[in-house]
């Protein structure tokens, strides 16, 4: 009984941690793309293409 409740607590904690981690990553990506779109308003491309073009100006 106690072992089952312990595993349930660990599972709930793992779900909360994964949701919090995913929300933090999505928030960072959102702010990064927002800063890119503001800093480069004339280049309406995908953020990955913008990063690739900035790193490789060929």
Swiss-Prot record:
Membrane topology value: Single-pass membrane protein
Any keyword Transmembrane helix?
A: yes
Q: Does the keyword Membrane belong to this entry?
A: yes
Q: Single GO cellular component annotation?
A: membrane
Query: Where is it localised?
Result: Membrane
State which residue ranges cross the membrane: 12-32
Q: What are the alphabetically sorted keywords of the record?
A: Membrane, Transmembrane, Transmembrane helix
Instruction: Name the chain's protein.
Output: Uncharacterized protein YLL006W-A
Organism of derivation:
Saccharomyces cerevisiae (strain ATCC 204508 / S288c)
